[in-house]
Amino acid sequence: MRADLEIIQDWIPAGSRVLDLGCGDGELLSWLRDHKQVTGYGLENDPDNIAQCVAKGINVIEQDLDKGLGNFASNSFDVVVMTQALQAVHYPDRILDEMLRVGRQCIITFPNFGHWRCRWYLATKGRMPVSDFLPYTWYNTSNIHFCTFEDFEEIGRAHV
């Protein structure tokens, strides 16, 4: 399991109702269901990931996050999770507002493009970083917003 998911699984109380935005192959929801009796849904737009979720018995909805979460009532989830997807939506501020509307608690992870390793890679190689954690080349990536922790704190203050 990815390191960020291992941390997140500890933060989610047993029996919670969870919405996982950009749930990928359903790894987090599957683990939470099996170990913490969590219920909920994953939202995903990649057909291969959706098929993997279905194979794992995960409740998954094919949905574009940029279209919002209007199909969910306010406060309908205990926790809304978005891991490694904020940088891939066109309007991060809108999805943050929607997350806060439908969930009592929100957990977000994203690649910190201001991390020293990213800056070092860029400075020494003259290229955007490519690694196990950032596996895409700049021209073939879903990452359209490159933010740092400072950037995220700023948008968070504006939308909380």
Locations of the language-model features?
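Conserved alpha-helix/loop element of class I SAM-dependent methyltransferases that forms part
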Residues: 1-15
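Class I SAM-dependent methyltransferase "Motif I" SAM/SAH-binding loop
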Residues: 22-24
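Short conserved loop adjoining the S-adenosyl-L-methionine
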Residues: 68-74
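S-adenosyl-L-methionine-dependent methyltransferase catalytic module, highlighting the catalytic core
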Residues: 93-101, 105-159
